[in-house]
Amino acid sequence: MAVTVETLEKLERRITLILSADTIKNEVEMRLKRLAKTVKADGFRPGKVPMSVVAQRYGYSVQYEVMNDKVGEAFSKAANEAQLRVAGAPRISEKEGAPEGELAFDATFEVYPDVKIGDLSATEIDRVSTEVTDAAIDKTLDILRKQRRTFAQRAASEGAVDGDRVTIDFEGKIDGVPFDGGKAEGFQFILGEGRMLEAFEKAVRGMKTGESKTFPLQFPDDYQGKEVAGKEADFLVTLTKIEAQHLPEVDEAFAQSLGIQDPTLEGLRADIRKNLEREVKNRLIARNKSAVMEALIKVADLDLPKALVQNETDRMIEGARADLKQRGIKDADKAPIPAEIFHEQAERRVRLGLVVAELVRTNQLQAKGEQIGAHIEEMALSYEKPEEVRRWYFGDRQRLAEVEALVVENNVTEFVLSKAKVSDKQLPFDELMV
């Protein structure tokens, strides 16, 4: 087989493949003979169908299959001999003017780019850290108490205050006309928790059971309901029930109800601290990793293979369709999703993937077995049944591959931070946890 390689624009290459027509013909005949042993046809015993009938029925499909296989083999061999790192599948087209007894094909494709990474020591990156304070533990305790609160109906003479669970009937109109979502009966919400617009809650605050009130409400310009955004509505609200909340005391009985190993107040706070520190650690890793990846994108110079960008765009479109399907959208598989909306993000992902791969390759940052095991062990110990979590990960290659990818990203993050010009900054707990 003779091979010629042409360099086209940037990453694009073309290989001309020359195949022997006899090789194709012999392979087709061999496959047809093999097929004839199992073919069934009316009027013939199994395996006794004449070759002429087999060729007439299956000749075209077998020849197509053989051509695909042989061209694919020839392309792989030629690319390997030329030491080309092929990015994406080649476009194959038959070429005219081949010598007698031969077939010629052009394979047009892209190769992976040379990735040039700038001076990491001159790259500035902010590395954040966060401390789990007593105030953070107190706030978590308040959340746990609210999750276990009970409610008791208030006396008819008492007005609604923040923390109460109120039940209301309401109807809203714009210019005297009702609108979708503007009417409900027996609607419940906790006053003061921000589920409703502040102006709505302000109007309900202080109302008593059985009381009705009419008030205007201005919808924000960025309100999620586009049909009412920026408009003023008039609401009629009737308060049918007020229930005062009762928060459990933070005592040993409360600690026991949470099922912690040391059901004392000290044990409860220690358990909360441990969980918060684990969550803070994971969020800091993600945040600092994001800062590193953003820096890598800026410091790297490379051309992007169009095929890889297209493949990533296609994956993102399929992901969007799967999301629509999960939400119950009819005919989600056929939803027209413009590729342009994902193009920029797809380019970013491909660029970052190539840069990370280059760093891993040139600095031996591959995930080690003990790193993968330690990562899984850390996750497993955060669950009630660690052994089940271990089995869940180690029993599936795809899950292990996902953990391996995370470990590689962490290795890259640590490597870049060790080389870059890092500024350490303290981030408030609440800001990190948003």
UniProtKB/Swiss-Prot annotation:
One cellular component (GO) term of this entry: cytoplasm
GO biological process, one term: 'de novo' cotranslational protein folding
Catalytic reaction list: [protein]-peptidylproline (omega=180) = [protein]-peptidylproline (omega=0)
Pfam name, any one: FKBP_C
PPIase FKBP-type domain sequence ranges: 163-248
Enzyme nomenclature, EC number: 5.2.1.8
A single MF term (Gene Ontology): protein folding chaperone
Compartment list: Cytoplasm
InterPro entries: PPIase_dom_sf, PPIase_FKBP_dom, Trig_fac, Trigger_fac_C, Trigger_fac_C_sf, Trigger_fac_ribosome-bd_bac, Trigger_fac_ribosome-bd_sf, Trigger_fact/SurA_dom_sf
UniProt KW Lipoprotein keyword: no
Domain of life: Bacteria
Main localization (coarse): cytoplasm
Presence of keyword Nucleotide-binding: no
Coiled-coil zones: none
Enzyme class per UniProt: isomerase
Record key words, sorted: Cell cycle, Cell division, Chaperone, Cytoplasm, Isomerase, Rotamase
Family to which this protein belongs: Belongs to the FKBP-type PPIase family. Tig subfamily.
Role, per record: Involved in protein export. Acts as a chaperone by maintaining the newly synthesized protein in an open conformation. Functions as a peptidyl-prolyl cis-trans isomerase.
Notes concerning its domains: Consists of 3 domains; the N-terminus binds the ribosome, the middle domain has PPIase activity, while the C-terminus has intrinsic chaperone activity on its own.
Protein name as catalogued: Trigger factor
Source organism of this protein record: Methylibium petroleiphilum (strain ATCC BAA-1232 / LMG 22953 / PM1)
